[in-house]
Amino acid sequence: MTFLQSTTRRRFLATSLLVSTVIFGATAPNSFAAVSKAEGAIAVNFFWEASSNSEMTWITRDVLITESGDTSYFSIIGNWTPPFYIGVQEIRNAETGEVRKNAIFSAWDTHDDGSCTNCGPESRPTNGRTVMTQVGPGVTPSQFGYEGTGANAFINDFGWKVGDRVRAVVNLRQVTDGTEISAALQLNEQPWRFFGTYKYAKKFANLEPGYSFIEDFGGKPMIVRSAEYGNTWMESEDLTKRAPISSVQARANTGANTKYHLIKQRNKTSLWAQIGGDQFISEQRYVPAVIEVPLNSYIPIEARLTTLNLEGGAAQSYKTQWLSNKSKVDPSSPATTTPKKISIVCVKGKTVKKITAVAPKCPSGYKRK
């Protein structure tokens, strides 16, 4: 079962975006040959553009999942440099029938063979290896191969469902001997959840608007999967620069089931797509959209604190600086405010603890409920 998009495909997507002709794809009800069972549902990729990404070290985007089923992957944010993606999946255990709706965060190695398609995770060289330096509560770290090599991690109890909105935030920062990226997720209006931190051996200066996609990773072409993406922008660390990501193009991949998809802008703030089944027939075209992005919104301080895994005095110090920076770019914003505390529930066997703090996290040995 394939969980990860290949580096080869990611590079193809980058190249095809540059040479694409932007035209709308025609759609119609199904009236042609049956869906091929030899391949899965075709993937649809979203390519995002901003006026500039210079000095942008923070990015946010959300996905509203409208239909899903077994072996579905909704990638929310992906970048080529640095190479990573983050999103949510649905997986059904064929033996037990258990359905797991998890979250996944993957980062590729940056050595010369980082894109190797026949290298297993055990063959990852030490030189250029991406490592996970921090692991969030309830997060299971791992590694991958055969689609490039790298490190990945899963939140197996994330528990999203159709109709939920999942928001992702990713931060990049340079360190002495490489680059770190950290991520957090929010399910609807629940508290933000720290995913983890990866460290690349290579240095990267900033994040990209990047890509998103909807994918069938298990060869189940009749299962319908759909979602809409939007509410996305980038920020610099000190808030002096902000770039709305207001331009996007979406396109289906090439395969036996390419025509069975639909891409449509159903409102001004997002772009929606559907794959799987035989409800719609569409030509393989780039479908562009202009997305309305809130002009005066910033990534919430709670999201930043969680993404950086800060708490206590470190969290308060960071928040004080953030409020000072925000007051300089937004005069209506007060420079100080009372920290907002949130509560989480942590369990260890039969022991249950409620933790309340500005950026709460479970004690060692406890798992977040």
Regions found by a protein language model. Give the residues of each.
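Aromatic sugar-binding interfaces of carbohydrate-active proteins
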Residues: 180-291
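Short, aromatic/His-centered strand-loop micro-motif at the edge of beta-sheets
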Residues: 143-167
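Secretory/extracellular carbohydrate-interaction modules
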Residues: 35-139, 155, 296-324
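Secretory targeting and sorting signals
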Residues: 2-33
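Polybasic, low-complexity, intrinsically disordered segments
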Residues: 32-35, 326-369
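Carbohydrate-binding surfaces in secreted/extracellular proteins
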Residues: 160-194
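Hydrophilic extracytoplasmic domains
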Residues: 258-332, 345
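Short beta-strand segments enriched in hydrophobic/aromatic residues
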Residues: 63-67, 172-174, 187, 216
